[in-house]
Amino acid sequence: MAGKKAPYGEFAGRKLKLKRKKFRWSDIRYKRRVLRLKEKSDPLEGAPQAKGIVLEKIAVEAKQPNSAMRKAVRVQLIKNGKVVTAFTPGDGAINHIDEHDEVIIEGIGGPKGGSMGDIPGIRYKVVKVNRVSLKELVKGRKEKPRR
């Protein structure tokens, strides 16, 4: 006669709970969360924003069916020296950013921390340039401080 797999009974709750725990490891979201894999691989190291220096301005081609050159910048992060690409949101926003400017970047808001819409491989966007909001610069409300 084969033994029972699951414990039965009025006080078997704790044992059942312990038995179910091992199946959590097959869930990829649980595994990534518990082992902190996002923080380990993330250039921002789990932080919401990061400061960096602009290395160069680039134009990235939009994915099909759209046809456009999305303006972006290559940024070297100050805290760890990693280089990432950040999108510059707004009409003519790239004109307000020069090489060697200090920028603050944050996630672009795509699904699962990935890229957004038709911009391939870009997971970050520029928020501030030399401590001034990029949005304000584009609207013309504020000017970039002269060095």
From Swiss-Prot:
Protein's UniProt keywords contain ATP-binding: no
GO cellular component: small ribosomal subunit
Classification via Pfam families: Ribosom_S12_S23
Keyword vocabulary terms for this entry: Ribonucleoprotein, Ribosomal protein, RNA-binding, rRNA-binding
UniProt entry tagged with the keyword Ribonucleoprotein: yes
Domain of life where this protein originates: Archaea
CDD domains: Ribosomal_S23
Transmembrane domains' residue ranges: none
InterPro entries: NA-bd_OB-fold (IPR012340), Ribosomal_uS12 (IPR006032), Ribosomal_uS12_arc (IPR022863), Ribosomal_uS12_bac (IPR005679), Ribosomal_uS12_euk/arc (IPR005680)
GO molecular function: rRNA binding; structural constituent of ribosome
GO BP terms in the entry: translation
Database matches in NCBIfam families: PRK04211.1 (NF003254), uS12_E_A (TIGR00982)
Function text: With S4 and S5 plays an important role in translational accuracy. Located at the interface of the 30S and 50S subunits.
Similarity section: Belongs to the universal ribosomal protein uS12 family.
Annotated HAMAP family: Ribosomal_uS12_A (MF_00403_A)
Subunit structure: Part of the 30S ribosomal subunit.
Name recorded for this polypeptide: Small ribosomal subunit protein uS12
Naturally occurring in which organism (per UniProt): Thermococcus celer
